[in-house]
Regions:
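C-terminal "lid/loop" region of Rossmann-like NAD(P)-dependent oxidoreductases
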Residues: 206, 210, 237-239, 247-254, ...
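NAD(P)-dependent short-chain dehydrogenase/reductase
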Residues: 130-134, 144-146, 152, 156-232, ...
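N-terminal Rossmann-like NAD(P)+-binding domain of SDR-like oxidoreductases, especially those catalyzing
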Residues: 1-177, 231, 300, 309-315, ...
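Residues in well-ordered alpha-helical elements
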Residues: 60-64, 73, 85, 92, ...
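Conserved C-terminal active-site "lid" loop/helix of NAD(P)H-dependent oxidoreductases
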Residues: 220, 272-297, 315
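Small-residue (primarily alanine) positions within well-ordered alpha-helices
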Residues: 79-80, 154, 226, 285, ...
């Protein structure tokens, strides 16, 4: 039975990846930081099937001990300080976890067993001020936030360990991916939660930043399958994972409010407080390599994704109201 370690298992991607690996017969070990309140809500339904251990990407010793104890076949590094606005408030912490944390994990693998396969969650935020449209594996990076900068470091240190120590280290450059498990601080979930509140009489308006902002949005449940496929190849490589389509925040609002028969124009207010200090440009992926090499393609459409998220928030808040 293969064993996989997932850092960031309590997050959106960690929970979907854990489900996928369990369905494939893996033993799943999740790593969570020691905190006074650990939120297990995304993996609550899995707690009897997985092992959750404490570990910290800022502590080299804890990572070596973790890898020695669990002897994994695969390690998926999904842990990060991943909310872009927070990376401006905590730039050094973002670097310590999101950048140096990758080095510490790779060092632990090199020290304990260099045959372990490693997946690094890279991000489309690395493209930032984009230098070509659409973005592919060879597109140069120009990150526009401390988070994006930290992810560029993590991406290149992964390639360095692959080339220098012959470690099977793959990097997935994932474009925005959402789900009903997305954190409420992210704009997509903020919208669907806001729509449900307005529909159920719990709210009157939704304040958002730049409605023109465009992203390539996909479903997180589809994207974790691409991660797994990367570690099943003969050779490690980098892959862009996205839908190849772009949509604006305004379009997201139209579909979300439309799902509950409301007109977004009556409820959405633009608030400049929510604008980013430096906005990224047109992020749109060219996922053709992932299609060719991994046989991967997204299954859930943009409209299905938005409606799935609205339905989930309606159900959650209706139950609370009852």
């Amino acid at each position: 039975m293969p064993t996989a370690i997932i850092t960031g298992i309590t997050g959106q991607d960690g929970s979907y990846l854990a489900e996928l690996l369990l369905s494939k017969g893996y033993k799943v070990v999740g790593v969570a930081r020691r905190a006074s309140t650990v939120t297990y809500e995304r993996i609550e339904h899995l707690l009897d099937k997985i092992t959750v251990v404490q570990g910290d990407l800022t502590d080299q010793g804890s990572l070596i001990a973790l890898i020695e104890e669990q002897q994994p076949t695969e390690v998926y590094n999904l842990a990060a300080q991943s909310f872009v606005p927070t990376s401006w408030n905590q730039p050094a912490l973002t670097g310590d976890v999101t950048a140096l944390g990758v080095t510490r994990l790779l060092e632990a693998i090199r020290y304990v067993n260099p045959k372990i396969r490693f997946y690094q969650a890279s991000s489309s935020e690395m493209f930032g001020k984009v230098l070509e449209v659409p973005q592919r594996e060879e597109t140069p990076f120009y990150p526009r936030s401390p988070y994006g900068v930290a992810k560029v470091y993590g991406h290149f240190i992964t390639i360095n360990y692959r080339e220098s120590f012959n470690i099977f280290a793959a990097s997935g450059i994932l474009f925005n991916h959402e789900s009903p498990r997305r954190g409420l601080e992210f704009v997509t979930r903020k919208i669907t939660d806001g729509v449900a509140k307005i529909k159920l009489g719990m709210g009157k308006e939704l304040r958002l930043g730049n409605l023109e902002s465009q992203r390539d949005w996909g479903f997180a449940g589809d994207y974790v399958d691409a991660m797994w496929r990367m570690l099943q190849q003969d050779e490690p490589d980098n892959f862009v994972v996205g839908t190849g389509e772009t949509h604006s925040v305004q379009e997201f609002c139209e579909i979300a409010f439309g799902r509950v028969d409301l007109d977004y124009k009556k409820y959405v207010t633009v608030d400049e407080r929510y604008y980013r200090p430096a906005e990224v440009d047109l992020l749109i992926s060219d996922p053709s390599k992932a299609g060719k090499v991994l046989g991967w393609e997204p299954k859930v459409t943009f409209k299905q994704l938005v409606e799935m998220m609205v339905d989930s928030d309606m159900k959650r808040l209706s139950a609370k109201a009852a």
